[in-house]
């Protein structure tokens, strides 16, 4: 038997000066143009021109369009993850303090963050498990402001099943974009 050493074709380099310059320019533009710049880049790269923040009306419309089998499956997964997260919090979340030496104390106190950003991949497939795992656990932990973010499909926006799942699991805001610059200005991060 003969084993050949084959090399994959070279891909575009990300370690050259021109690439770094392009990325730095994009990031600088995003810092100054904020949501407008994000919308422009989403239009350019993702071929999506819709709203960045998914409205309550759109969520309700999507909820009605999802078939019952999918809804049942998502609810089943959500319930399982929620039950486990609650048990984990109950059994792991015990605060404690010990005196290591006279006057020197160490301990643990679990405090949820105010805001959690939950990225939900949405390339060729709707990765609803990412929505279930990240949004549900943040909700159980007591996070007050949960923002779910998923990339858009051309001319569609985020996958409807991702939007349905993020909403069911307790996301407070659902955005369609790749960047954190699309967080609503009302968020306290």
PLM segments and residue spans:
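Conserved small/polar residues in nucleotide/adenosyl-binding loops
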Residues: 1-5, 179-185
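N-terminal Rossmann-like NAD(P)+-binding subdomain of aldehyde/semialdehyde dehydrogenases
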Residues: 4-114
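Alpha-helical hinge/cap motifs
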Residues: 34, 142, 180-184
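Conserved small-residue-rich beta-alpha loop and adjacent elements
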Residues: 98-165
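A glycine-rich helix N-cap at a beta->alpha junction
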Residues: 165-178
């Amino acid at each position: 038997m003969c084993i050949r050493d084959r090399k994959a074709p070279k891909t575009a380099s990300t370690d050259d000066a021109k690439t770094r310059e392009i990325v730095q320019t994009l990031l600088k533009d995003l810092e100054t143009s904020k949501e407008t710049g994000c919308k422009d880049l989403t239009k350019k790269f993702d071929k999506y021109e819709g709203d960045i923040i998914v409205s309550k009306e759109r969520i309700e419309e999507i909820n009605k369009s999802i078939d019952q089998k999918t809804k049942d499956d998502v609810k089943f997964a959500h319930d399982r993850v929620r039950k486990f997260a609650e048990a984990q919090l109950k059994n792991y979340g015990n605060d404690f303090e010990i005196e290591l030496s006279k006057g020197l104390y160490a301990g643990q106190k679990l405090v949820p963050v105010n805001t959690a950003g939950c990225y939900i991949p949405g390339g060729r497939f709707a990765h609803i498990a990412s929505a279930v795992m990240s949004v549900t656990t943040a909700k159980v932990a007591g996070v007050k402001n949960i923002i779910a973010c998923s990339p858009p499909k051309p001319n569609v926006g985020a996958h409807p099943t991702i939007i349905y799942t993020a909403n069911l699991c307790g996301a407070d805001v659902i955005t369609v974009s790749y960047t954190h610059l699309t967080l609503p200005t009302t968020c306290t991060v």
